[in-house]
């Protein structure tokens, strides 16, 4: 009798464990699957091959723009404001768009301004100049813009036609065609993996919300030790 009672008790305990496990499974199945706020192919594109970023310890955010693009000028105050609250583990960079021959001189202007470390206002002046005439390729008019910031025409001409500037333009063109697969501006590439554009239900302000989402996605994929340098900014 004692042996039978012991066997029944063990059976009861086994049944209790089994029932508890079944309840856990049923409960888990009843929970709805979390739906991502932003979806690849709809709100952003996944690049076919990841692109090497400059700083391995940072999440890179790369803006693609063109001075002849009115939408890029509209996006400018948004991206500038976003930069001010950018987390410490994020690195921001820009690359001028180069798809056509007429865009090469405009890309060179960006690299001249970068080399001279000119204030942000020069970019606004270049937007204003080139949005009015997208095919403009007048070195004297370009130099006149830089003269407002104390750059002599001689210094401008030297940098504008320099081997270094030409090399950067060539590199930007190759990168956009073969790596970023960019076809419009403004666009933002997050950590060399995701390309974000406006349109199709994504506004310019919405672009930055998608960018923030992708930053979190990349941050969550980093090793735990790297997270201590996370969004402290």
Q: What is each model feature region?
A:
Residues 2-101, 216-233:
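Extracytoplasmic thiol/disulfide redox context detector
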Residues 76-83, 106-110, 123, 139, ...:
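Extracytoplasmic/secreted envelope proteins and their assembly/folding machinery
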Residues 67-71, 98-102, 129-136, 162-165, ...:
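Solvent-exposed loop/turn segments at secondary-structure junctions
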Residues 87-115, 120-147:
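Structural microenvironment flanking redox-active thiols in thiol-disulfide oxidoreductases
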Residues 72, 102-103, 135, 139, ...:
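Alpha-helix N-cap/helix-start motif
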């Amino acid at each position: 009798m004692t042996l039978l009672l012991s066997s029944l008790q063990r059976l009861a305990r086994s049944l209790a464990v089994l029932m508890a496990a079944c309840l856990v499974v049923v409960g888990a199945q009843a929970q709805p699957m979390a739906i991502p706020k932003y979806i690849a192919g709809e709100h952003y594109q996944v690049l076919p091959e990841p692109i090497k970023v400059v700083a391995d310890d940072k999440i890179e955010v790369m803006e693609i723009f063109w001075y002849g693009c009115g939408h890029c000028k509209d996006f400018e105050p948004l991206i500038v404001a976003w930069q001010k609250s950018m987390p410490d583990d994020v690195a921001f960079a820009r690359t001028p768009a180069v798809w056509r021959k007429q865009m090469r001189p405009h890309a060179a202007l960006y690299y001249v301004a970068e080399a001279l470390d000119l204030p942000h206002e020069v970019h606004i002046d270049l937007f204003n100049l080139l949005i009015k005439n997208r095919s403009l390729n007048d070195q004297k008019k370009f130099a006149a813009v830089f003269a407002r910031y104390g750059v002599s025409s001689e210094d401008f001409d030297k940098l504008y036609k320099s081997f270094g500037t030409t090399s950067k333009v060539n590199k930007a063109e190759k990168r956009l065609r073969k790596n970023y697969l960019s076809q419009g501006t403004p666009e933002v590439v997050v950590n060399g993996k995701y390309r974000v554009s406006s349109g199709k239900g994504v506004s310019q302000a919405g672009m930055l919300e998608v960018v923030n989402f992708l930053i979190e996605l990349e941050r969550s994929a980093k090793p735990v030790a790297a997270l201590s340098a996370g969004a402290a900014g």
